[in-house]
């Protein structure tokens, strides 16, 4: 599945038939997908940013490679096989000198054994949309709602010691709330949500 957005494709359309994630891609300044070339793929820029990141973070005391922890259910061979594919993708994409995926396991409860203890570097999760509106997705990442499951349960940004990260989440939350307040013009609502979503993706 080719996807440059956080909101799923095919969920929302503007009055002229434009699919919502196309608005997000436009806000990100990405060209239209031609069915072959990944629009965010820029190997030269990646190598430049990688070298810059290694230099800056090494000066801050970070050692490389960085190890990203990913958890699967113990005894679930399908999950382990998928994780190994992901590990290889990390290796092929980042290089083993930059970011390495470490696969770990939990026994019975990923929430109790991993998420609540903040042991994960990232998590792969998702669900089918409950209703056809960007709030269904973006509302999960705001910093001002107990209903923001992914922010509260997985992201933990509100608990971060980084003022910069907290400020970015506050800006994102403000954009989402402004979009959610538009109820009399659905095209304007979707445009505002696309702005918020692009902001989130630009700062991921």
Regions found by a protein language model. Give the residues of each.
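Extracytoplasmic/peripheral linker and loop segments enriched in polar/acidic and small residues
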Residues: 1, 30-42, 96-111, 136-204
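Append "and occasionally in soluble cytosolic enzymes with long acidic Gly/Pro-rich linkers
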Residues: 1-92
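Extracellular/periplasmic catalytic domains that process cell-envelope and extracellular macromolecules
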Residues: 61-64, 115-118, 201-203
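Loop/turn elements at helix/coil->beta-strand transitions in domains of secreted/extracellular proteins
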Residues: 64-67, 95-99, 118-122
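Active-site-proximal beta-strand/loop segments in catalytic clefts of secreted hydrolases
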Residues: 71-75, 104-106, 125-128
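Flexible loop/turn segments at secondary-structure boundaries
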Residues: 76-80, 109-112, 130-135
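Short helices/loops that flank or line small-molecule/ion binding pockets
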Residues: 84-92, 108-121
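Ligand-binding clamshell of periplasmic/extracellular solute-binding protein-like
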Residues: 122-138
